[in-house]
Curated annotation (Swiss-Prot):
Species name: Xenopus tropicalis (Western clawed frog)
Protein name (Swiss-Prot/TrEMBL): T-cell leukemia translocation-altered gene protein homolog
Matching InterPro entries: TCTA
Gene assigned in the entry: tcta
Lineage: Eukaryota, Metazoa, Chordata, Craniata, Vertebrata
Membrane-crossing residue ranges in chain numbering: 36-56
Compartment annotation: Membrane
Segments forming a coiled coil: none
Record bears the keyword Metal-binding: no
Amino acid sequence: MAETWGSEIMTQALGCLQAFSSEFALEWENSDMKAAIFKLLLGWIVLSLTAIHLAWKSYGPTVNSIYYRQGMGGQNGGTPEYPARFPIWESSSTESLKRHQE
């Protein structure tokens, strides 16, 4: 039964994809303006991703070293474990926890 449902779902999905692609191809042939805008936006995305890749290739290690410093104090290098302006609330094991009682 599970195989039947799976094959029906795949058949429907492939049918929808085929209908969409044929409709897209027909629309592509009929509309030069949409095709030009699509090509322009696709080129812009490819150019942007290429620029991001090149920038990360040259500046990536610098950015990475800023956020992941090696050394004492955890992830950010010299950062203390507890900030100085906040008190550390410590409790000993002999101290009972306060509970709400009605």
